[in-house]
């Protein structure tokens, strides 16, 4: 089958790789000059299945009000003048219940755990290198309230059989030796030893090269204007003055997926703006070993070979990609507070990207009501974590194979009806 994939981020490239490996003829189209040059370029670098969780959580609405008045708030909202933003925020609010949080987190952990397994198999098969580490993820708490609040996440981890360790402030240094110097600031931590880290942009670039060896064709610097429809199916992709045709089409354009498919299927994917800095390491003994999540500021601090990546925050501000110095200040404050002297933040590069977020946090992977149109988008802050699993899952669905995990509640159809009790539809 001839397949056109729109988007060459980590999710689009992973889809291309697994579809090509399944025997399909694949072409990837992207407006950028190469793979992973937009949202996948400088994310936090963590591969954290156990920490896969929706931003829509109990208590978040009240916290959002409090964060409006805080200098280093992890969430900010600025109206963009669209009705879609208001609808999306209302849908997110409806998912901020204990029941919905558990349901959505369970779906996300299922896909994320599977994706980690797919990544490990890929690494064993291809020996792909991307500055990866397998040192786990450590979430640190600054207050007893935060530590107690982790109980709801631990319950989901137990149900999903995800290994975890609950650490006291004195035990944190076992996982991250550099935290010994600041243990007095911390109450404890939750460690997931099965998590990994790695440079997403480097991984995507090298996976694209492996995909090319399987026959995948990449068309970069190509504008994607519209999907042409005929007879109730996609007839082609309008790219400037050219119509690109195939048998099936995959939209993996992240936040830009929504507008492209708007006339065919309504998907609640909104851009959630995030920031990162990447600083050179100056003292490895004072730097993190793997990924550390600061629960207070919702910031991830990740170790690469000779760099520290610090990423986080969420701004609901539309497609605004302006860099804000205040956000850089928050990232620098956080890493210097937990790992003083580890990296040179004055020499750090500053970046922002738009994560494609659904109101329930769960990505949209699979078929649509249009017979030959498929989606692989809406992964939010977890595109890197979920990429390989989403790609393999989509390849299985498009090849007529039974997926290794449940997939029906990951498709866009969960938003199209709220009457099917078995599917436990999302609020959208």
Curated annotation (Swiss-Prot):
Q: Which reaction does it catalyse?
A: a D-alpha-amino acid + A + H2O = a 2-oxocarboxylate + AH2 + NH4(+)
- The answer to whether the entry has keyword Flavoprotein is yes
GO BP, one annotated term? D-alanine catabolic process
- Return the similarity comment: Belongs to the DadA oxidoreductase family.
Enzyme class at the top of the EC tree? oxidoreductase
Recorded protein name is D-amino acid dehydrogenase
For this protein, the record's Pfam families field holds: DAO
In the UniProt record, does the keyword Oxidoreductase occur?
yes
* Alphabetical list of InterPro entries matching this protein: DadA, FAD-dep_OxRdtase, FAD/NAD-bd_sf
What are the required cofactors? FAD
Q: Name one GO cellular component term.
A: plasma membrane
């Amino acid at each position: 089958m001839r397949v056109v994939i729109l988007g060459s981020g980590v999710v689009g490239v992973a889809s291309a790789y697994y579809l090509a490996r399944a025997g399909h003829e694949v072409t990837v189209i992207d407006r950028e000059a190469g793979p992973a040059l937009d949202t996948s370029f400088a994310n936090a670098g963590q591969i954290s299945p156990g920490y896969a969780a929706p931003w829509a959580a109990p208590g978040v609405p009240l916290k959002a009000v409090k964060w409006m008045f805080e200098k280093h708030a992890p969430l900010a909202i600025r109206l963009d003048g669209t009705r879609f933003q208001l609808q999306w925020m209302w849908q997110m609010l409806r998912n901020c219940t204990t029941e919905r949080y558990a349901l959505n987190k369970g779906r996300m952990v299922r896909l994320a755990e599977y994706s980690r397994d797919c990544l490990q198999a890929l690494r064993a098969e291809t020996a792909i290198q991307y500055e990866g580490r397998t040192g786990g993820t450590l979430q640190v708490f600054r207050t007893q309230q935060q530590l107690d609040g982790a109980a709801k996440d631990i319950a989901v981890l137990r149900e999903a059989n995800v290994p975890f360790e609950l650490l006291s402030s004195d035990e944190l240094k076992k996982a991250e030796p550099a935290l010994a110097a600041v243990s007095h600031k911390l109450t404890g931590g939750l460690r997931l030893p099965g998590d990994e880290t790695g440079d997403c942009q480097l991984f995507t670039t090298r996976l694209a090269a492996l995909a090319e060896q399987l026959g995948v064709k990449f068309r970069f610097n190509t504008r994607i204007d519209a999907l042409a429809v005929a007879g109730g199916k996609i007839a082609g992709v309008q790219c400037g003055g050219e119509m690109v045709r195939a048998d099936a089409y995959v939209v993996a354009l992240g936040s830009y997926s929504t507008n492209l498919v708007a006339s065919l299927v309504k998907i609640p994917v909104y851009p959630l703006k995030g920031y990162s800095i990447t600083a050179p390491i100056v003292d490895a003994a004072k730097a993190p070993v793997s990924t550390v999540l600061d629960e207070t500021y919702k910031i991830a601090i990740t170790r690469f070979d000779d760099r520290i990546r610090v990423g986080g925050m969420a701004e609901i501000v539309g497609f605004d990609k302006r860099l804000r110095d205040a956000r850089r200040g928050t990232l620098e404050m956080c890493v210097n507070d937990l790992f003083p002297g580890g990296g040179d933040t004055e020499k750090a590069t500053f970046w922002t990207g738009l994560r494609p977020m659904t109101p329930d946090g769960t990505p949209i992977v699979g078929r649509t009501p249009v017979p030959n149109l498929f989606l692989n988008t809406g992964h939010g802050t977890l595109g890197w974590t979920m990429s390989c699993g989403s790609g393999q899952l989509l390849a299985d669905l498009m090849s007529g194979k039974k997926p290794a995990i449940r997939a029906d509640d990951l498709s866009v159809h969960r938003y199209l009806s709220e009457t099917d009790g078995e599917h436990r539809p999302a609020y959208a």
